[in-house]
């Protein structure tokens, strides 16, 4: 190593250690002036010798070249959201579910930061990649922007860290940084941000990382994600793993506390609520997690959230305002929803001018009229709702809210079925509002995932009568697309190609895309795995549908009702005729489940089957598909760039096959 290289390496190491002391240990070891002097020395040396710039140099935090767009990242392990508790009774019910299954537990309590969840990957101790949560499965690559956040180390401290470490945490904007940013925006005549969360989101999603670098974002780690190639055993508790993250140089909130009783959990909640305004960052509740990792694994997950954690939200903020009028909106399933138009009021960090009234029963329960003064609450600090009226402020000319008998969009009759609170337009796809929402849903990422088919394009297609149903999308040509605003031939050709590519999907996605009431992603997947074919789903009676996991009587009736409607069957048949297809899910008799009781693991990149297809095929044969290798693993399927799982399988003597052998085994070769 040359003298210049050694000097640069020493400066990088010293500056990084000072960063950790400042941001992680909260114990600055040098003055700001001294730190700045070291940084200027490093920048000068790097300017003279750009070929010697290290990957973990703090100089890289100033931002690099602007991007054209963010690329997508598939998370190594889903980034789930949390279920919410809004009252003590909600948390007590959560605690009962926990203790009924795994006995007494300790909880870890930590502030629920009002920011953005991110995933950060370190390989061999070096910062490699960062991504947003996105939809939980796929996020956006924000590596260059996260690199500019000074509290996030570019290299892990110490030793003993695994080959691959994924850290989950929250990026936020401190209150002081938010105030300073808005002052700068105002001075320049630019738009100001409503709250720190929006400012953090806007800063993190800048295509130009120099802009991100100019905004003082913070970060706290709150969990480990995927870990591969452990050098030493990981801590068996969440509290221990947070301490481990801090030892590696990652910032962890000082407010985290281990509580061994419900009384201590409630005391923590009350304390942090009382000190909320004194904290340097915005929070909107407390996250409570089961401490013991083995008990977390035993409790497992539901479709969208872990069973072992909950967000205990703070009481929502409330304000009074005037209800000026009520409009009625029609949704994708025909639901007619009354929307209150309000005199704008600032509640919980945002300006609120609309609030849902839900349905006729809710209007009657509130006794609300047009002209009333109402109390607005942001439920969970997110969704504005009217919780009460102020009777003494009611004017003499207050007007009753009259629910429409005919759809405000298509004039079809509005019906309300016995036992249901929601009134619905009977127009189906004849109703323009339902058409628009149905096609938006059909094209959405979790359904057919038509790249580039945004809401505004769908609205134009329907307004120009180019599309009447989802099936009509597949008859569009590039020349037809150019009739839309700001749609040149190149963009039109690209969009038509995306529509064509969406024809190949999965049965679960197709079922979800149909927009059947109460059938979400998880239920659609359960229907696909249970019945194996669309024909079987179409023909299933209510009793057969009730045999499917998570399908109750109401959902079963909705599914049956959907497929009993001639116009729905016509749309489905047109979609199939247009060429929509998916890999066949082979039905296997119980005595033919040749992998029943076996545990398989997939690793690396598969080139002919995607990971979900391979997993579905193995599960159809009775296998459990796990995410990590252990002595109980029966077989590892190793794709390209298999990595540490392959090495561990070989070490444990686990059977290993490649993708070609898997295809032969599944009868899909050739």
From Swiss-Prot:
Catalytic residues, chain numbering: 112
Keywords: DNA damage, DNA repair, DNA replication, Ligase, Magnesium, Manganese, Metal-binding, NAD, Zinc
Residues the entry annotates as binding NAD(+): 32-36, 81-82, 110, 133, 170, 289, 313
GO molecular function: DNA binding; DNA ligase (NAD+) activity; metal ion binding
Gene Ontology terms describing biological process: DNA repair; DNA replication
Pfam families: BRCT, DNA_ligase_aden, DNA_ligase_OB, DNA_ligase_ZBD, HHH_2, Nlig-Ia
InterPro entries: BRCT_dom (IPR001357), BRCT_dom_sf (IPR036420), DisA/LigA_HHH (IPR041663), DNA_ligase (IPR001679), DNA_ligase_AS (IPR018239), DNAligase_adenylation (IPR013839), DNAligase_N (IPR013840), Hlx-hairpin-Hlx_DNA-bd_motif (IPR003583)
Domain of life: Bacteria
Matches recorded under CDD domains: BRCT_DNA_ligase_like, LIGANc
Residue numbers binding Zn(2+): 407, 410, 425, 431
Function, as annotated: DNA ligase that catalyzes the formation of phosphodiester linkages between 5'-phosphoryl and 3'-hydroxyl groups in double-stranded DNA using NAD as a coenzyme and as the energy source for the reaction. It is essential for DNA replication and repair of damaged DNA.
Protein's recorded name: DNA ligase
Protein's organism: Shewanella denitrificans (strain OS217 / ATCC BAA-1090 / DSM 15013)
Lineage: Bacteria, Pseudomonadati, Pseudomonadota, Gammaproteobacteria, Alteromonadales
Gene symbol of the encoding locus: ligA
